[in-house]
Design a protein with these regions (language model features):
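Bacterial Sec-exported substrate-binding components of ABC uptake systems
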Residues: 2-16, 20-89, 194-221, 286-295, ...
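Short helix-initiation/N-cap motifs at beta->coil->alpha
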Residues: 70-71, 125-132, 258-267
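Short helices/loops that flank or line small-molecule/ion binding pockets
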Residues: 79, 133-140, 267-276
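A short, structured surface patch at a secondary-structure boundary
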Residues: 83-135
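Alpha-helical, coiled-coil/dimerization segments enriched in small aliphatic residues
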Residues: 111-112, 233-263
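Proline-aspartate-enriched helix->loop->beta-strand connector
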Residues: 140-146, 162, 272, 276-281
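Extracytoplasmic substrate-binding proteins
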Residues: 153, 159-226, 323-346
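Structured C-terminal subdomain patch of bacterial secreted/periplasmic proteins
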Residues: 278-346
Length: 346
């Protein structure tokens, strides 16, 4: 089992799964007298897959979101479902990587990375945020998957088919370790545990290798419409500092702008020069959302050219769709980390 893009390094263990496989045979069955496979209904209990929702009013609008004070519940779903609607593109990515992509029958309107282009013509079921419930129902799926952007739609989608929320702890944050746990759950659901374990091992090896090679300060930037958003440690893209080991060129507390902004703290070329990072790690949010690519053009200016990163050819352009749209699918994680590894390895 390999990724559809550049090869990976091999790697160790994965977090324990919170899944239980239940074979529903007759009460008189035993280990020596089990019902034949075609007479057995098999289900998988997916732990932490049902969020508790609460209604919120903000700026005159009312919407549903997860009440994180209430523990999540388990959801029982069919083993090896043959028809899946997913609003979570990380799930599409992972199912594709483990050979179960043909089970996906519907996805939201979204710009897909090239390696998922074969799914572009699937029936559309709304947006990442707003499902088209009628379109979902017409597809009659055995399983619906939501995450992060679509979590608030969990209850209504559950009225159509068994639904699981695979947001996990990361909730829109680049979190490879969390992504591996969710991938392992999908492996259990689809009977592809070995494929997930193999690809996850490769990713873990990438992480360990990068950690052994990282040196210097960094500034993580999203670029869109000629503007920059900077992310510090502990942010949705803080993984590059918190886990991989880059030293923040500017501490998160010292970044300007609105603390915790989903799009980062707005900074300027002059700010970047003053921070003078050894590495600039950038991704093109505009390109990820289908608004055209501008990151390299934006950073190609006489002010940024004076930074240590620019002078040492140490501006790293991450694959934007993988980092911003797909986020934590197996191939997306592999591609993002592969780009970083290639840069730091020289």
């Amino acid at each position: 089992m390999t990724f559809p893009t550049r090869s990976l390094l091999p790697l160790a263990g994965i977090a324990a799964l919170a899944l239980t496989v239940t074979a529903c045979a007759s009460p008189s069955s035993s280990a020596d007298d089990a019902a034949p496979a075609d007479a057995t209904e098999t289900t998988v209990v997916v732990e932490n897959a049902k969020p508790a929702l609460m209604q919120v009013e903000e700026d005159g609008e009312t919407y549903w979101t997860e009440d994180t004070e209430i523990p999540r519940e388990a959801v029982e779903v069919a083993y090896q479902p043959e028809s899946v609607v997913t609003f979570d593109i990380a799930t599409l990515d992972t199912l594709h990587a483990i050979g179960a992509g043909d089970t996906v029958v519907g996805i939201p309107e979204v710009a897909l990375p090239d390696y998922l282009s074969e799914y572009a013509d699937l029936p559309k079921v709304g947006s990442l945020f707003e499902p088209d419930f009628e379109a979902v129902a017409e597809l009659d799926p055995e399983l619906i998957v939501v995450a992060a952007r679509s979590t608030g739609q969990f209850d209504e989608l559950s009225n159509i088919a068994p639904t699981i929320d695979l947001t996990g702890a990361y909730g829109g944050t680049f979190d490879p370790e969390g992504g591996l746990v969710r991938a392992a759950q999908l492996g259990e659901i689809f009977g592809e545990e070995e494929a997930v374990a193999e690809l996850s091992a490769d990713i873990e090896e990438q992480i360990a290798t990068i950690q052994s090679e990282v040196d210097g300060t960094a500034l993580v930037l999203s670029v869109s419409g000629g503007e920059y958003g900077a992310f510090g440690e502990g942010s949705r893209f803080g993984y590059f500092f918190d886990t991989l080991g880059f030293t923040p060129a500017v501490a998160a507390a010292e970044l300007p702008g609105q603390e915790g902004s989903a799009h980062g703290d707005t900074v300027t070329n002059e700010f970047i020069l003053t921070a003078n990072p050894d590495w600039i790690i950038a991704f093109d949010r505009g390109a990820a959302t289908g608004q055209g690519s501008s990151a390299e053009e934006t950073l190609d200016n006489e002010i940024v050219e004076r930074t240590t990163a620019a002078q040492n050819d140490a501006i790293v352009y991450l694959p934007a769709s993988e980092l911003y749209i797909v986020i934590n699918g197996l191939t997306a994680i592999h591609n993002v980390l592969g780009t970083v590894h290639e840069a730091v390895a020289g």
